[in-house]
């Protein structure tokens, strides 16, 4: 979208109307009609507000391609999307594909770009209508999310999208190999495209720059920040913390995030007798993340299978020394951090202890990490 000769149309389930549209057009799937309704201009304008131009609504209405009157729609003939992960997720994926059929018939475009399995059916639908090339962007696979206990329905949707794709963009070489080996894709159409982070804005820099010098902090803080699911390896973080606390007591551990393993992790910390050194603040967002990273002396990402892993870049950007698992995509491009196997809790404990007690190591990882990211 930064190229002057490129025009982007971004189709999202549920816009709020305050999105930045200076560099792309936004079409809300919740505002795209699939059932013809006889509604006047003023009413459409009042109902849609800043979410969609009424003229676009009418243009889309003219491209309804089938009788969907049996489906539940609102007074504008639109399907409502939650914008979240509801219990009827498969229904929402199918509905998204139906709506995509209207947009694909009305819009003009050269390339279709579908992000992750939730939008693959919509991408396939658009390709079948237009004959335009389909790029699927693999941010993660069910092999990553499930530790190999793959959901066959999800797998089939993922594979179908990849089979129909003209190009498969993977967030790392690690993910690319999974796509080739487990989804049986042609290596020639699979490419690795690593993620990145934006430079910190001034208000975030103001937070980060409040970090206390190493010598002023008698008690060090070690942080895990992410979903508490088996993919992220939270149990290895707690086991490593237990080993660190057998050697020193001037360290506290923060496990920030939420997920289906949260209660299990709280119990594990209690069983190891280290609950008094642990904090479980729950899910964080926005400035809370940077406040947490600013107060952290070590950041640990012990993921069992991480397609990329953006959080280490955010931590290093804040000057927080970082430890990551070798089983992560970001390990392919990051050098000024400590890399180890997720299961090697002895090495993880040694790395945490060393950073917390060696000022030179702390400063090197902090300074070089900022420079590298």
PLM regions: where:
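Aromatic "clamp/platform" in nucleotide-sugar-dependent glycosyltransferases that forms part
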Residues: 304
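Conserved acidic donor-binding segment of nucleotide-sugar-dependent glycosyltransferases
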Residues: 337-345, 354-359
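Conserved donor-binding/catalytic core segment of Leloir-type glycosyltransferases
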Residues: 169, 215-232, 238-241, 366
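Nucleotide-activated donor-binding/catalytic signature segment of Leloir-type glycosyltransferases, i.e.
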Residues: 263-284
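A conserved catalytic-core segment of Leloir-type glycosyltransferases
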Residues: 7-104
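Short hydrophobic beta-strand element within catalytic cores of glycosyltransferases
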Residues: 321-324
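A short, well-ordered alpha-helix in the C-terminal region of glycosyltransferases
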Residues: 347, 354, 361-373
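Carbohydrate-associated surface elements
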Residues: 174, 196
